[in-house]
Swiss-Prot record:
Record note on quaternary structure: Homodimer.
Metabolic or biological pathway, per its Swiss-Prot or TrEMBL entry: Porphyrin-containing compound metabolism; protoporphyrin-IX biosynthesis; 5-aminolevulinate from L-glutamyl-tRNA(Glu): step 1/2
Miscellaneous section: During catalysis, the active site Cys acts as a nucleophile attacking the alpha-carbonyl group of tRNA-bound glutamate with the formation of a thioester intermediate between enzyme and glutamate, and the concomitant release of tRNA(Glu). The thioester intermediate is finally reduced by direct hydride transfer from NADPH, to form the product GSA.
Species of the source: Corynebacterium efficiens (strain DSM 44549 / YS-314 / AJ 12310 / JCM 11189 / NBRC 100395)
Positions with a binding annotation for substrate: T47, C48, N49, R50, S107, E112, Q113, Q114, Q118
Function according to Swiss-Prot or TrEMBL: Catalyzes the NADPH-dependent reduction of glutamyl-tRNA(Glu) to glutamate 1-semialdehyde (GSA).
Catalytic activity: (S)-4-amino-5-oxopentanoate + tRNA(Glu) + NADP(+) = L-glutamyl-tRNA(Glu) + NADPH + H(+)
UniProt-annotated site: Important for activity, residues: H97
GO biological process per UniProt: protoporphyrinogen IX biosynthetic process from glutamate
Residue positions binding NADP(+): G194, A195, G196, A197, M198, S199
Family to which the UniProt record says this protein belongs: Belongs to the glutamyl-tRNA reductase family.
Protein name, per record: Glutamyl-tRNA reductase
Gene giving rise to this polypeptide: hemA
């Protein structure tokens, strides 16, 4: 298992913007990934705050390099730039990362619920595209189950925090309004551009904050009308304007929230009437609103980049909020990795039984050739007896090897033999040879930065293979 990605923690927004993928590009990219001989499965999580490629690879070095090359080919970002900002997690560390992400623990707003839906969508799309196999099926389902447990069994999202609420609270603060006050948007009108998930969340949150009126605009007018009807049902007055006429209402609103993912800017400086006091909130990646709008007198702007900056300056509460959630992640990760280790040992057990059966048949053929006068009844009894001995001899190690595989860490060859065959420990006077070492005794090698550095011992090595 391998994950190669970048997020708000590792990369500037401008670079995340260049790597942002819509559904079409994401499908194209996963297909390109599994065409590489080293990669057998692929799933991509692409949001405004992260781009992560989850894969199953037959070779760590080759797999990482193949992922980086595909990202370069799809995005046009040069490989050296990618190397400077991408992070890599491998094996159990990769599995843990998806569980942490799906639980909202790696989000800019810790505990936000949108990410679990985004992981689910990524999984569904990759499944439909045929780029997900047994390993990623098991991992994605475990991650979604873990995320659900975190949100139902802890208080991590008690405050209902999300990227949308964080952005609007930030906008209110910049407007000189206390977000914690009762109905802080009372007497205000807001324009919502777009009618997707983010826009719907924004409209709902604006309604809860007491906005007097919402104006909706979307390229497909019917979707804007549907969103407006939901607002009306919630008791918030709403109207719809054609998307092409959105600039005509800017002198009537106090706030604009844009989440369209459009190719062109939805709001430009030339669209803004002179003398207005206007708060612009851009929730899109790539960005919807031209940064130059913030230079217009009376206009302020909140966007993903500015939210990142604000969160870095005030990262409060993350550790306390995530303690209980991390305990759930650890529990689910242990169960997942145990199941994977058991699954991985099954082919070896099958091969052992197959080989034992082949040897048994060979020996029976040899015995039959050497005892031609043995009666048919006696031969059947010999065959049954030999097969019973083989089955009894293999039964215990077959059961025990699965239990042994389920444990984390490693054991010595001597201990493995004793465990598999139920043997009593043999006391020796000579010091035992060192045949294994626990991963916990080594430096943490589950996380690798993609840099041109010397090779390291363990799970991780430098990307350039030096």
């Amino acid at each position: 298992m391998l994950v190669v990605g970048m997020s708000h923690r590792s990369a500037p927004v401008a670079l995340l913007e260049r790597l942002s993928m819509d559904d079409s590009v994401r499908g194209q990219t996963t297909s390109a990934l599994v065409e590489r001989p080293s990669l057998s499965e692929a799933l991509i999580v692409s949001t405004c705050n992260r781009l992560e490629v989850y894969t199953v690879t037959s070779s760590f070095h080759t797999g990482v390099n193949d992922v980086v090359e595909v990202l370069h080919e799809i995005s046009g970002v040069d490989i050296e730039t990618l190397r400077g900002y991408l992070y890599v997690r491998y094996a159990d560390a990769a599995a843990e990362h998806m569980l942490v992400v799906a639980s909202g623990l790696d989000s800019m707003v810790v505990g936000e619920q949108q990410i679990i839906g985004q992981v689910r969508t990524a999984y569904q799309q990759a499944t439909e595209a045929g780029t997900v196999g047994p390993a990623l099926h098991a991992l994605a389902q475990t991650a979604l189950h873990t995320g659900k447990r975190v949100h139902t069994e802890t208080d991590i999202d008690e405050a209902g925090a999300s990227m949308v609420s964080f952005a609007i609270d930030r906008a209110l603060t910049q407007m000189g309004i206390d977000p914690a006050s009762d109905k802080p948007l009372a007497g205000k009108t807001a324009l919502v551009l777009g009618a997707g998930a983010m826009s719907s969340l924004a409209a709902t949150h604006l309604g809860r904050e007491g906005v007097d009126k919402l104006i909706m605009a979307n390229r497909t007018r019917e979707r804007a009308e549907r969103l407006a009807s939901h607002s009306l049902e919630a008791g918030v007055p709403a109207e719809v304007v054609d998307f092409a006429d959105r600039a005509s209402v800017l002198d009537r609103v106090d706030m604009v929230v844009s989440a369209t993912g459009a190719d062109d800017f939805t709001v430009k400086p030339a669209d803004i009437p002179a003398g207005v006091q206007l708060m612009l909130v851009d929730l899109s990646m790539p960005r919807d609103i031209d940064d130059a709008c913030a230079e217009v007198p009376g206009v302020d702007l909140v966007n993903i980049e500015r939210l990142h900056r604000a969160k870095r300056e005030d990262p409060t509460g993350a550790a306390a909020e995530g303690a209980d959630a991390l305990a759930i992640v650890r529990e689910e990760l242990e169960a997942f990795t145990s199941e994977q280790r058991i699954r991985d040992v099954v082919p070896a057990v099958s091969a052992l039984r197959k080989r034992a059966n082949e040897l048994l048949l060979d020996e029976l053929d040899r015995l039959q050739a050497r005892t031609p006068d043995i009666s048919q009844e006696d031969w059947k009894e010999v065959t049954r007896t030999v097969r019973r001995v083989m089955d009894k001899f293999l039964h215990e190690p077959t059961v025990r090897v699965k239990k042994l595989a389920a444990r984390s860490g490693s054991v010595s060859y001597e201990s493995a033999l004793q465990e598999l065959f139920g043997l009593e420990a043999v006391q020796t006077t000579a010091p035992p040879a060192i045949t294994s070492v626990n991963a916990s005794d080594l430096p943490d090698a589950g996380i690798v930065a993609i840099v041109n550095s010397p090779s390291t011992t363990g799970q991780s090595v430098s990307v350039d293979g030096s």
